[in-house]
């Protein structure tokens, strides 16, 4: 597995885009996508020779990231690419990680499977199944 992106919760996705551009030189890589399952808006930012940043804004109070945004936002997860998401989940569970979200279609990844796990260091981990369509998006 390799790191794909860092997920950061923001109060306003538009303000977040502007902040990351002004302060760190990141450019908007994708359109803003609404993830109806997680009740969030997401956008990917990129900078040459740097890790991708995914900004995450809750769309309502029932979003899993709403409380983080309400407190000002912050680091939410590290995302890793994997080739066989179910096998990787099984392996990580044997190492003590706990599944938070079972594999489901990820709207920001052309509905290729994603899953969230929680490690014993209290850090959310997102797994991205690197199917054919996902590779096209991830490698841009």
Predicted regions and their residues:
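A cross-kingdom feature marking solvent-exposed beta-strand/loop segments within repeated
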Residues: 29, 62-68, 76, 95, ...
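A short, polar/proline- and glycine-enriched secondary-structure boundary/capping micro-motif
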Residues: 23, 64-68, 136-140
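Long, hydrophobic N-terminal alpha-helical segment
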Residues: 1-38
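Vicinal oxygen chelate
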Residues: 3-12, 32, 43-46, 53, 65-140
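Short hydrophobic interaction/assembly module
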Residues: 51-69
